[in-house]
Amino acid sequence: MLTTRQPGWFDRLDRRITQWMAEHGLTLLRLALGVVFFWFGVLKFFPGASPAEELAGRTIETLTFGLIPEDVALRILAVWEVAIGLGLFLSRWMRAVLLLLFVQMLGTITPLFLFPSETFTIFPVAPTLEGQYIIKNVVIVASAIVLGATVRGGELSPEPVVETRPT
């Protein structure tokens, strides 16, 4: 394998940038997720403001066998998402916040199966705009998994970590 050595200035710059990313990446990820959940949650308090509200309301109504009407479902979902957003902003109760997030994501994916004619033009390869909106949530789930890996004090390291195993 050929490796080329970078000039000294480039290596120093690369190390500084990598160090900055390691120091701030998790915080920025947490805040970015918080913005998404808070913003989308607040939209659900205003009828017609969220492009996903009709599908979300029908999904919850279907999952609860009609016990929770669509308008009530949207208010519950709005509070739920705002709570997740605030928890992420404040970096408080992260285990509970991430649990709420994962449960919400399970609910978010169900329209792909409950309403495939609305979420795909050709099932399962060509999603509609609503389907794409749902499928992109894999990025949110992956981000939450990364944050979850830090609830016990884990962190990012800008340098390789060599694990030593007891012999």
Segments from the language model and where they lie:
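Membrane-interface extramembranous regions
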Residues: 1-167
